[in-house]
């Protein structure tokens, strides 16, 4: 007769095999759940394992650390590129959360077409966090839609070809009876937009967050070569749209 503990061990092993086989069968039957679980595990791994290492390695080798939030496909050389849905080489950073940097450690922060995707309160907290992590003299540059430009669509204060090109750019219907109405609704509600600023509101928010030197620029225009090298929308064939309906602000700590 074999000892009981061997039998018990064999039983447990069999139970594990049966459980795993059942789980595999269930996931094969429900690929949607498999995809959801897989994506969650990958996201957690990216956030908790990959991102801390990416940030640590970058901060150690960079003499003037620069952070790009909401980078998307724009992986700028010399920058720590981040996104809420990061690629394999990007850090996971959610601008509604505390930024994972020590006080006064970054040289520059860039957010191109990002801040409008969060609420006003979340945006203000991000500005406060940016002020905290920037070194004295460090700069934050924000490029975002300008609400005044969309209000101007209801007057004659717009480029003649703007509305047709805007509708074409977003694949919106060209035969809409009121293009201005369609565009402003789209800009306020599409792509997860939460809050679209006027220049007055954005300047006031940055100043309230602690920035002393706040300046407005046209998109793509800057005195800082670091920002000029990484900003992308001002370099595309749709530059004319960006020039009219977006604004850029730089704020110095």
Which residues are covered by each model-predicted region?
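Conserved SAM-binding loop
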Residues: 64-152, 249-253
